A protein has these predicted regions:
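Alpha-helical transmembrane segments in inner-membrane proteins
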Residues: 1-339
Length: 339
């Protein structure tokens, strides 16, 4: 009976996430200066029918942005889950540990260097630069983790690494041309605006391939959650496994930072929301729930960012912080009460 109840709960949870995703997808497509009926939206998406202005707005502007939000929101959430698993730390995440700031730093260097020479920047170059920055920051975090076993100190160290990277980024920006500063400033605040179908295709390839590998690692992750000794007894190569966790989480985080800039709290808050909804920590269930939850959370936050003070658009990172930070505070309070 318990197994049946759990199966029903899992099913209901995924249905809720799927319904929210569809609802927010339609709401986002319809939100903006031009409002369209659901039928008009469906005709444009599936039949490519509609007046020229509506078609251009939906197909060339809104759809690439919405799909980018779904893909990158899901990727960032899964990246946070992998980092929490690696460090066995409930508030580990790309933003808090300074990994996003490291990616931001290297991308800033690349943008200023190439834009000052009137050289366009491809999606692949941005992702590689962000990945390099993520790995550099992760290297520093791992060095600190070896010396410090206290959760609070690890988080503080990550925040300090983030501040250092941000300070260097600000220093670099002071020597950039005005036009380059505008491009970098808009990107560094965190935004899903300006996405193209080319960006979406690149995201799909990178995130899909990474997620396939993550799914295949569900069983080793499940064993690792029960302790390194147990995982070793189950045949998991701990060194290879830990390296893969770092690489996969960094790739997902780098992809997000390259296209949308640093986005806060999604990688921390959503995995805990997914676990609370499912009432389980099984990776085979939590990973897809994290992806769907991250997509839903970011769709909601992007909708707020675009519409609340329209035509002025808020930074997506500011909105995610407003809704994500309370979750982190709740996690820390609950953990303290258990001690």
């Amino acid at each position: 009976m318990n197994d049946r109840k759990r199966a029903v709960r899992y099913g209901i949870s995924f249905v809720i996430l799927a319904v929210l995703l569809i609802f927010l997808f339609i709401w986002n497509v319809n939100s903006g200066s031009i409002h369209l009926s659901v039928q008009e939206i469906l005709n444009i998406i599936f039949r490519h029918q509609g007046d020229e202005i509506s078609y251009t707005i939906v197909w060339e502007i809104r759809l690439p942005r919405i799909l980018s939000v779904i893909i990158l929101g899901g990727a960032l959430s899964v990246s946070g889950f992998l980092l929490q698993t690696f460090f066995n730390n409930p508030i580990a995440g790309p933003f808090v540990l300074g990994i996003s700031s490291g990616a931001k730093l290297i991308v800033a260097f690349l943008m200023i260097f190439l834009l000052s020479r009137s050289v366009s920047i491809g999606s692949g170059a941005m992702i590689l630069a962000a990945f390099a920055g993520s790995m550099i920051s992760m290297g520093f975090v791992l060095l600190v983790a070896k010396k410090v076993h206290n959760m609070s100190m690890l988080v503080i160290s990550g925040v300090m690494i983030g501040y250092i990277c941000s300070a260097i980024t600000d220093f670099v920006v002071t020597f950039a041309d005005d036009s380059n500063i505008v491009n970098l400033h808009n990107w560094s605040l965190g935004s899903f605006s300006g996405m193209t179908w080319g960006n979406v295709r690149t995201m799909v390839v990178v995130v899909f391939l990474t997620m396939v590998i993550v799914f295949f690692m569900s069983k080793p992750i499940s064993a690792y959650q029960l302790g390194e000794t147990y995982a070793q007894n189950m045949g998991v190569n701990i060194k290879v496994f830990r390296i893969l966790l770092i690489l996969l989480s960094s790739i997902l985080s780098a992809c997000v930072t390259a296209f949308a800039g640093p986005i806060s709290f999604v990688g921390i808050a959503v995995p805990h929301i997914a676990k609370s909804l499912l009432k389980t920590a099984k990776p085979l269930l939590v990973i897809p729930a994290c992806f769907l939850g991250g997509a839903v959370f970011c769709l909601f936050c992007d909708l707020i960012a675009r519409t609340v003070f329209a035509p002025t658009e808020l930074s997506i990172s500011s909105v995610t912080a407003v809704f994500g930070a309370p979750v982190v505070i709740y996690i820390m309070i609950r953990r303290q009460q258990r001690i």
